[in-house]
């Protein structure tokens, strides 16, 4: 689907090359930016190249690159407000880990979906996540259209269990170009140091 956003205030994030903002148009073709311009001739050329393009009037709106959340545990949206103002290790050992031990994979997906929708509504288009059942969180990423770097998390996990988790993640979403995988520590103090070595 081709889109053309017109009459928007564009914040291109290239201040050293261009003015900080300008009024113009942004064209999208084949899921890629194909036009960022205030030149009426280039905007009209985009229309001719893409007959039937869907136009969206951005008058009074700002168009900018999506924000990136570089550290989150998106499924923990369900735990917001559960235990606040507590020292980290007490918070983890006495509240969070016991709570998480009771969670089902479906509840983790629900928390992830809520967190992803919240991020999208706030302009976040990419996030880096580290949590349990990332292969299931990847399903939510696929459904909701956001980009993600999902971290295979480990805490008291054997190398074999960790490798199985990574294989599940890749099998679940290996063909989705919006998802990347990485290795991330979930906790400041994994008790099994062999995996981190």
Task: Describe each model-derived feature in a short phrase.
Residues 78-110, 117, 144-152:
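Active-site gating loops and adjacent loop-to-helix segments of metal-dependent hydrolytic enzymes
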Residues 126-184:
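Mid-domain alpha/beta scaffold segments of enzyme catalytic cores
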């Amino acid at each position: 689907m081709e889109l053309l956003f017109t009459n928007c205030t564009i914040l291109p994030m290239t201040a050293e090359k261009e003015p900080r903002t300008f009024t113009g148009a942004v064209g999208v073709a084949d899921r890629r930016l194909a036009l960022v311009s205030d030149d009426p001739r280039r905007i009209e050329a985009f229309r001719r190249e893409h007959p039937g393009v869907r136009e969206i009037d951005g008058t009074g709106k700002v168009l900018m690159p999506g924000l990136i959340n570089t550290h989150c545990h998106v499924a923990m949206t369900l735990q917001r407000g559960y235990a606040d103002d507590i020292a980290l290790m007490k918070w983890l050992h006495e509240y969070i880990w016991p709570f998480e031990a009771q969670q089902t994979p479906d509840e983790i997906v629900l928390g992830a979906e809520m967190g992803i929708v919240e991020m999208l509504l706030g302009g976040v288009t990419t996030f880096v996540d580290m949590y349990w059942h990332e292969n299931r969180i990847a399903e939510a990423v696929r459904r909701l259209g956001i980009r993600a770097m999902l971290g295979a998390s480990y805490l008291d996990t054997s190398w074999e269990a960790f490798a199985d988790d990574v294989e599940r993640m890749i099998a679940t979403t290996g063909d989705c170009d919006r998802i990347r995988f990485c290795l991330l520590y979930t906790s400041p103090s994994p008790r099994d140091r062999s995996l981190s070595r």
